[in-house]
């Protein structure tokens, strides 16, 4: 929802994920947006509002790219905070990450780096199978079934 709202506000087609990602890949520069995680739960309301306040009709293409980069960076920050919270609560050795967010190359790379740094095994579906969270549920179920024999 966060990605689509920002993308549409920038004039991108809906769903906006791949279009916003294309903008984000045009730069490494950005002005940070907040990330919000409380008790292991992510809220994108604040980051989305902050991003929406930056959007105006006179934005240059590079400003749009920087905002897109900031959006995905804030999502990555939130994901890392959430995972860190949960791995402190429970012993975790593996992470299954599937859904629309994991079809994004920036977030996928970020999760790979985070998991490697924190000695977590990362299981992800191929990007074309990560466009919808229903895929994530199916992937997780298949993984559990396989691990139980």
Outline where the language-model segments fall:
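Acidic-glycine-rich active-site phosphate/pyrophosphate-binding loop
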Residues: 51-52, 57, 106-120
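Conserved phosphate-binding/catalytic loops in two-lobed NTP-binding clefts
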Residues: 95, 112-137
């Amino acid at each position: 929802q966060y990605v689509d709202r920002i993308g549409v506000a920038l004039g991108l087609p809906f769903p906006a994920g791949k279009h916003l990602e294309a903008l984000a890949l045009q730069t490494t520069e950005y002005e940070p947006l907040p990330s919000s995680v409380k008790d292991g739960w992510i809220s994108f309301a604040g980051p989305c509002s902050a991003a929406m306040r930056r959007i105006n009709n006179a934005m240059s293409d590079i400003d749009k790219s920087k905002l897109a980069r900031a959006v995905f960076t804030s999502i990555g920050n939130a994901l890392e905070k959430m995972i860190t919270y949960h791995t402190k609560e429970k012993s975790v050795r593996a992470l299954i990450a599937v859904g629309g967010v994991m079809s994004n190359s920036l977030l996928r790379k970020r999760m790979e780096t985070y998991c490697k740094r924190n000695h977590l095994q990362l299981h992800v579906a191929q990007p074309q199978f990560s466009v919808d969270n229903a895929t994530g549920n199916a992937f997780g179920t298949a993984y559990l079934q396989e691990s139980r024999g």
